[in-house]
Amino acid sequence: MTPAAHGCKRVAWCPSRPPASAPSAPQEAARRGDAMGLKPSCLKGFKMCVSSSNNNHDEAPVLNDKHLSVPNIIITPPTPTGMGLSRDSNKQVWMDELGSYQDDGELEPEA
């Protein structure tokens, strides 16, 4: 581990329900949760490790209470195994066992 990684803390296990004691404001927030299923009380003291642009690829700085501007990125899943994408939407292209692509109608030429 790098020295910067030693400064990172893991998010502690958090029960899905607050204790039976009278709920406080943080407990109410923890009970509601958010769309991601994370409870705010679980994130208390959480540190995030990210890479920086200082060209040091061995260490990641530890950031506390900082807002990161992250662009919206759409990641598309890979195509199903053995199927390639053709330029002609009416015709599918399949990948053979050797990893090369063939059109549906074209078989290997006979010798």
From Swiss-Prot:
Positions bearing Phosphothreonine: T79, T81
Region annotation Disordered: where it falls in the sequence: 12-34
Residues covered by region (Required for interaction with PPP3CA): 71-76
Keywords: Phosphoprotein
Domain of life: Eukaryota
Disulfide bond positions: none
Keyword Phosphoprotein annotated: yes
Statement: the UniProt record of this protein carries the keyword Phosphoprotein: yes
Pfam family, one: DUF4597
Stretches assigned to coiled coil: none
Subunit structure: Interacts (via PxIxIT motif, when phosphorylated on Thr-79) with PPP3CA.
Name under which the protein is recorded: Uncharacterized protein C16orf74 homolog
